[in-house]
């Protein structure tokens, strides 16, 4: 148990365009070197592109896509008597969202489209269809947890 006081989580202000805390949080994941206006441009550009392609509400689309990428379980390394076991654990809700956002941004960055906004839009559209690198990452994590189910009694 830590002796220090537990720090309260900061409240994220909703984004100016859609008034969505989730999109504001996603912008923070996209942001590099504190350049929030650049991150805003990327995220809004990607959501506009998604809206053009699918003719749907971008916020609802983003929420639904994020839900498809969220992992339910993950593996954590646990040392028992000189051996390290990959122990499957359920992921808490806040971490689920954070991992999904991180995976989406990482997958988008590795794509080959010209701008980051186009890459992000492409990755969001792929994830909505159940394909793409972010979905593959989620499936890999779930597969690892399933493969190591035998060690689930080594809970933390």
From Swiss-Prot:
Keyword tRNA-binding recorded: yes
Pfam family, one: Ribosomal_S7
GO CC annotations on file: small ribosomal subunit
PROSITE patterns in alphabetical order: RIBOSOMAL_S7
SUPFAM superfamilies: Ribosomal protein S7
Any one GO molecular-function label of the UniProt entry: rRNA binding
Any Gene Ontology biological process: translation
Role description: One of the primary rRNA binding proteins, it binds directly to 16S rRNA where it nucleates assembly of the head domain of the 30S subunit. Is located at the subunit interface close to the decoding center, probably blocks exit of the E-site tRNA.
Complex formation: Part of the 30S ribosomal subunit. Contacts proteins S9 and S11.
Stated name of the protein: Small ribosomal subunit protein uS7
Species for this entry: Acinetobacter baylyi (strain ATCC 33305 / BD413 / ADP1)
Gene label: rpsG
């Amino acid at each position: 148990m830590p002796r220090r006081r537990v720090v309260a989580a900061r409240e994220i202000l909703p984004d100016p365009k859609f008034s969505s805390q989730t999109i504001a949080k996603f912008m923070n994941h996209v942001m590099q070197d504190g350049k929030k206006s650049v991150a805003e441009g990327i995220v809004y550009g990607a959501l506009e592109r998604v809206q053009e392609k699918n003719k749907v509400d971008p916020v609802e689309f983003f929420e639904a896509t994020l839900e498809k990428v969220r992992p339910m379980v993950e593996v954590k390394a646990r040392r028992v008597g000189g051996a390290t076991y990959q122990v499957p654990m359920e992921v808490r809700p806040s971490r689920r969202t954070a991992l999904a956002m991180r995976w989406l941004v990482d997958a988008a960055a590795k794509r080959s489209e010209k701008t980051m906004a186009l890459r992000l839009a492409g990755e969001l559209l792929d994830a909505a269809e159940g394909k793409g690198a972010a979905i593959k990452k989620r499936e890999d994590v779930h597969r690892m947890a399933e493969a190591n189910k035998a060690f689930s009694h080594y809970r933390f």
